[in-house]
Amino acid sequence: MQVKNPILGLCQKATFALSAAKVEQCPEDQGYEVAFAGRSNAGKSSALNTLTHASLARTSKTPGRTQLLNFFSLDDERRLVDLPGYGYAKVPIPLKQHWQKHLEAYLGSRECLRGVILMMDVRHPMTDFDKMMLDWARASGMPMHILLTKADKLTHGAGKNTLLKVQSEIRKGWGDSTTIQLFSAPKRLGLEEAYRVLADWMELEDKPVA
């Protein structure tokens, strides 16, 4: 008997809901939200678009252009949230400070936030931003799942070695609560594992398919 992950159908129906420059503009704080975070150029928008089978999240050759909290509805009570990209050098310092202020406000205040998907470029993992997010997740008790993106840029062996190395570093520094996987948007690598995490956080059960 095959088992169908219900999050797949919801992701395929994802629609843009709204953009918020600050927490006060976010949707009502109820239901289930999963946020996608990552340094600029870590492949966050590409991952979101691949998971939803759509071009919902804006991709740009200029990293750091995502300046707002962007909300995408899966159904009446479940949402994905594209957080501002962080760390692009050409972004003016006042704008960086604005992003950081409202990113911290969102992460610290949303009762409906069930988990954070953190994107790391598999070739450059564990940046200062990544460690800051891991510190926050541990302190707040927030579930976190890491996508080591752009896995297609490495050989299978090199990707696996990086996965094991980052896993070990996270366990030593932050414990066992954070999960991690390889992911490639162009190759659609790691989709099912990511869908299982989303379904678990959004309290959706797998359904048997005859």
From Swiss-Prot:
InterPro entries: G_ENGB_dom, GTP-bd, GTP-bd_ribosome_bio_YsxC, P-loop_NTPase. GO terms for molecular function: GTP binding; metal ion binding. Signal peptide: none annotated. Residues 30-204 form the EngB-type G domain. Its cofactor is Mg(2+). One of its GO terms (cellular component) is cytosol. The keyword Transmembrane does not apply. Pfam families: MMR_HSR1 (PF01926). Keywords: Cell cycle, Cell division, GTP-binding, Magnesium, Metal-binding, Nucleotide-binding, Septation. Mg(2+) binds at residues 45, 66. GTP binds at residues 38-45, 64-68, 82-85, 149-152, 182-185. GO terms for biological process: division septum assembly. Belongs to the TRAFAC class TrmE-Era-EngA-EngB-Septin-like GTPase superfamily. EngB GTPase family. Necessary for normal cell division and for the maintenance of normal septation. This is Probable GTP-binding protein EngB. It comes from Pseudomonas entomophila (strain L48). The lineage of its organism: Bacteria, Pseudomonadati, Pseudomonadota, Gammaproteobacteria, Pseudomonadales.
